[in-house]
Amino acid sequence: GMHGSDVIQTGWALARALGTIEGTELVIAGNESTDGVGGAVPAIIAEYLGLPQLTHLRKVSIEGGKITGERETDEGVFTLEATLPAVISVNEKINEPRFPSFKGIMAAKKKEVTVLTLAEIGVESDEVGLANAGSTVLASTPKPAKTAGEKVTDEGEGGNQIVQYLVAQKI
């Protein structure tokens, strides 16, 4: 199976699965998964499918067979565009999350989910999985636990204390 597959293998398998869907104009992916934060899988999918890719987008619009997106970096905001079909990945700034209604949850439970086997998408078992991965994780370190931060009791000087803290942090 797919257990232990690296990003290249995962991208390959997803590209093969997407290739079974006729007429796909747009593939939308996130930047992270539950087992990694590389953000490379959408670009790998696009490469295997031979499609343009716009990654790490915070804003997207589609008009006349063209997709335009904004990517924010430390250097500024960049506008990117490509013709459809395309693969994009979006970040957490793309929208305000909405929570489904109870009715929506119940309707979703009734929807059929298509499950494809590796054989059905044309992926051989020796092309994926931990034993066949092209990369190896040598070590990992858990994220440090979040601290509560510094608390300020405002007795008339709270604003000054916050400013002093921000200056000390070079913020």
Q: Language-model segments: what does each one mean?
A:
Residues 1-171:
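N-terminal glycine-rich FAD/FM-binding segment characteristic of electron-transfer flavoproteins
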